[in-house]
Structure formats: structure tokens, C-alpha cells
Amino acid sequence: MSCNTFTLGTKSVNRLGYGAMQLAGPGVFGPPRDRHVAITVLREALALGVNHIDTSDFYGPHVTNQIIREALYPYSDDLTIVTKIGARRGEDASWLPAFSPAELQKAVHDNLRNLGLDVLDVVNLRVMMGDGHGPAEGSIEASLTVLAEMQQQGLVKHIGLSNVTPTQVAEARKIAEIVCVQNEYNIAHRADDAMIDALAHDGIAYVPFFPLGGFTPLQSSTLSDVAASLGATPMQVALAWLLQRSPNILLIPGTSSVAHLRENMAAEKLHLSEEVLSTLDGISRE
């Protein structure tokens, strides 16, 4: 297998994928400002080699999945679409947990309908506990069991997790085979270092989101200086660092701009020297 690919479920995917969240309107709510541009971005992503798209029917809600269907259906055999359940949107655009059996079942069927599929490639259980802004401890057995039952019914091929703790990952793996874990992780926030290494050992994908999220001004300045020295953007350096961090890391940077999409995809060709990696590794301690 190429170092630029990794197995997600039963398919080999390019490690630099695409996150569709920004295709919806402002605040990931409502329709995009320009639907034609959103469709163009998706088609360009595939033309640039993307075969792993991350989405959810609670983006919009419904909007992002409908745009994906309009842009890409019928889907290429090598395309893996990963979606999420476990949350819903309030009328005021708020993010709310949706963990009851009925809500989880409805979410799977909404994803199927709006994507135009009979079975979903990968469904991540998005866990919203505590304040909902980061992983918090609590059992996910009941919710994951509902998802596993839908897998047994043939509605879902593979199961993943999102916004989870190591304890929840261990709990989930006793209930179902887990093919990916999606958490916030970047150069500045490395709480999942041990988790990434453990998942890599077991051949499980790790999908970080917010590659530039939560940086302090000092951390941003260091990253910007490194990027300038390489003739690259901070986002390109952040993505390149993630690609070199571990072979099981799959990236899903999102954008609603073709120009930014092309910039992001160019990160795959950016090689970071040991000296640069050492500087970047120090950012989390600044």
C-alpha cells in the first residue's frame, strides 16, 4: 500500500480527503451562498484525487448531503462517503445531542435518503456529552448498540466514532468493529498522541479535525514563520505535519473555495525536514 493511502473499512483511500461541512450556509446552517460553487468544489476535489468525503445530514441540516448527491451521483466505486449521527440542529441553528434509538435510526435513514444510497459506507457515532465541545466520559454502549443493530440490518457497512475518549473507544471495540476515530487534533493540541499510536498499531484510521483550531497567538506566529520559510501556507504546513505524524491519519480539510481546495491538496507534496518537524513539535509546549 502506498504511504499516501490507508484502509478505511474495506477500501483503500487517499489520506488527503475532503470535509463537506463548509458546503452548507454560514454556521453550517441553511443553504450555501452559491450552490453552483459548492458543486464545483466537490467535483474538483474528486478530480484532484479525493476519494474520501466526510459529511453528515446534520450539516445544513440535509443540505450538504443533497449537494453531494447532486454533484457526484452516481458515485464512483472507489469513493468512500463517511457520515455521522448523534446530533441534530435546533431551529436556532444550535447543536443538540440526538442519542435516542429513534433519533439514531432516523439519522441513518435521513443520510441514506439524501445521499441516494441503499447502504452507508461508514457511519461515525458523534458523541455529545458534558458541554458538547470536546470529549467527555460516559458510556456509549446503548447508542452504539443501536448503530450496530443497523449494521446487522445491512444499512451500514462500517462503524466509526467521533469526539470520544480512550475509555469510550475501548468500550466501543467490545461492541462492534471500529474502523476510524475522529477527534480534534493538531500541532498545538496533542491530547490524542497515545490514542493515535494505539490505533495505528491495530490498523484503525484516525481522522483529525480543526487542523488550525485553538492556536494561541504565539503558536500561530511560530507556524506562520515556518510556513513562510517553506513558501507555504500555515494550513499546508499543518496538514503536512499531520500526514507525517502517523500513517493511519486521514485528513478531511474543508473549504467552500476551489482555490483553497487546491492549496490544501498541495500539502500532500510538502515534505517537512527533521529540523522543521522539531520546531513544529515544540508548538504544543509554547
Please tell me what each predicted stretch does.
Residues 1-79, 285:
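N-terminal binding-site loop/beta-alpha segment at the start of enzyme catalytic domains
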Residues 50, 117-120, 156, 178:
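A structural motif
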Residues 112-133:
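Active-site groove signature of glycoside hydrolases
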Residues 22-36, 91-102, 131-136:
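Active-site mouth loops of central-metabolism enzymes
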Residues 31-45, 99-115, 165-170:
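Short, acidic/polar
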Residues 78-91:
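A short, structured active-site edge motif that brings together acidic residues
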Residues 10, 69-80, 113-116, 173-175, ...:
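Acidic (Asp/Glu)-rich catalytic clusters
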Residues 128-286:
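Beta/alpha (TIM)-barrel catalytic core signal, keyed to glycine-rich beta->alpha loops juxtaposed to Asp/Glu
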